[in-house]
Structures are given as structure tokens and as C-alpha cells.
Amino acid sequence: MKITALELFHISIPFAKPYKLSRVYGTRYDAEAVILKVHTDEGIVGLGEADPLNPFSEETPATVMVVTRDHLAPQLIGQNPTRISAIESNLDVMVHGNLLARGAVNMALFDIVGKANNLPAHMLLGGLYQDKVPLLGPIGSGTPEEDAEFIGELIESGYKTVMIKMGALPIRAEIQRMIAAHEKFDGQIKIIVDANQGWTVAETLEFFDGIGSRRPALLEQPIDRHDISGLKRIYQRAPCLLSADEGVASIQEAAALIRAQAVDAFSIKVSKNGGLSKARKIAATADAFGLKILMNSMLEFGITQAASLQLGCVLPNLLNMGHAYMSVLRMSDDITDFDQNISRATVTVPSQAGLGVRLNEEKLKKYTKDYLKIK
């Protein structure tokens, strides 16, 4: 089998409602992605997805398309797509960085190999550890009253974990949000606080002091991704689990955080981490040192969500809480059928070959802003 061509589709789809994040990311009204098709001479087509989010990463939809055209495609066309490790090793030498573009390719290769052997991708990653995973429900920045309304709706829908976005408001306001949510819903739902790099070390410590015993189950990436020493200071004072997200894109960053003993968990995002192969290495390294994994998401569509699920279901070190397999639910539409796997705040691992997701060609055409084919 050989790779014969690549197709790239830059898509944009609005959110169902505006998504308020931290002061770093602002309010988001739509999500963009680059959808990848990798064609083979046997007629098997592998699907991948890159999910750029500025300033989360330096990559944009335009850079993903250019890097794929100019640097990745020349290393892929004519190659045997089943030799995933060899391709990964070659691209590590030939293409530095660009993990989002690399991730789309890696997803597509696993999709091809799974389809060629009539196996779901999780069978290529170690086999099922769990066949169902609970979802977390995300809540954007808002008031305590808005939080209470959204959390109540999530509980009615079966959610047991909520991720509250913070980092946009003054720290005293964020403290009040945490206290209000804990006092109203304690015992009914686990609370994750995600500050998305929106705080300083001092603000984070003030948050800990202010909430007292009304602590979340987990705090994610409160400060700048590069400040490992600051994160360690927070870790030493944290009354809850602490996870890194923006600060753990590569295996080298994961190793640095482990050496520093700065976190309890890593937030895995298959697109951010450069695909299934690299994300699997990060998760395995975390497990070896006793760290847990939160399967999180960028502003993703169904292909990345499907790839993430294929990985998450094989990991023995997932956190005992909800995980971010609800990304397509916050969109006004999706270009796949991934949502059919979701019921009552739980996602069931599909048994179909490859990534286990189907592309809706009409919707792909509808939402495409730019297109590129490389032979």
C-alpha cells in the first residue's frame, strides 16, 4: 500500500453559543480546523484533523496547510502508510515542531491501518481498558448565577463532572464563583477549574486561601505554560490535584514537569500533542511516574474527538472524573457522526475499523473556507 495524495479542508463552524474563556483566550464565537484526507492506492482514505487555536499554539489553519503541502506531503507521498513508526521517526528529523499538522497526519495513518486490517484504532494502541468514558461539561466564564443555571442543567443531563473556565475575571470574583458552586452542588458533581494561564502565582495562591475548604477536584494550568518553577510553588500549596495543559505539548515538556515534580496530572489533547503516537508516549510516561491523565480537547470536531477516544479508552491512568468528549456538542454543527456515540453524559467506544467515525461530505463542503490537494 502507498500514499498517493493528500486533501486539506480549512473549515469554520460557529459555536451553539459564545464560549467565554480566560483573559488570554477571550470569547470564542466559532471553531476552525483543518480536515485531512490521506488517500492510498488501495482506495482506503485516512482521516485526520488539526485544531489550531491562537494563542494556544503558534500554528494557524494557514500554516497547517502550508507546512503539510511543503514539508509533510513530500515525505509522505509514495510511502507505505502502515509503517507509522518509521514515518514518525522520519518526520521528527525533517519537520521540527508543527505538532498540530503532524497530529492530523498521525491520526490519518492510524485510521488507514485500522481500516486495512478491519480493526478499531484502540486495538493498535493496546486494546480496551474501558469501553465507556464519562463526559465533563464545560462552562464558560460568567457569574455565580449563570454557573448555577448551567451546572443544574448538566446534572439533569447526567453529568458528574463540570469544568468551570476561570481566568477572565478579578480573582475575588473567581473565588466567589468557586464558593457558590461548591456550596450549592457539593456532593452532586465534581468541579474542575481551568484558568487557561489566566492567573499569576500570587493570584492562584490567593484563590486557594479564599476558597478555604470549598476546593475543586482539580485545577488546570493556572499560570503561564513556561513557568515550571511557579507551577511547582502552586503544586506545593495546592489543596487539590493540579494538571498541566498548555505546558505539556511535547514529550520533552512532559519530562521537564515530571523532573520538577510540579503537577499531579497531564491534560492530553491528541491534536496538541502531535497525534496518537506522541500522545500515547506522554500518557505512558505519566503512568510510569504515577501521574494521571485528563483526556481534554481543543475546540475540536469529530475526527479529533474520535482519535482521542481511541486513545483514552486504552489508558489505565485516566482520572476518575469526566473527560472532554463533548466538544462537538458545543458546536452548532459537526462534519462527522461522532455524537452518535454519546448518551446521557457518557461516550461509548465504537467498534468500527480505524478511528470509528464517518465524514459527512455535504457538511464538509458547506463549511470549507479553503481547499488544497497534493499529489
State the predicted function of each range:
Residues 126-238:
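Metal-dependent enolase-superfamily TIM-barrel catalytic cores that perform enediolate-based chemistry
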Residues 106-140:
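Glycine-rich, aromatic-flanked loop segments that form ligand/cofactor-binding clefts
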Residues 3, 36, 43, 72, ...:
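Conserved, mostly hydrophobic/aromatic
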Residues 330-375:
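C-terminal extensions of enzymes
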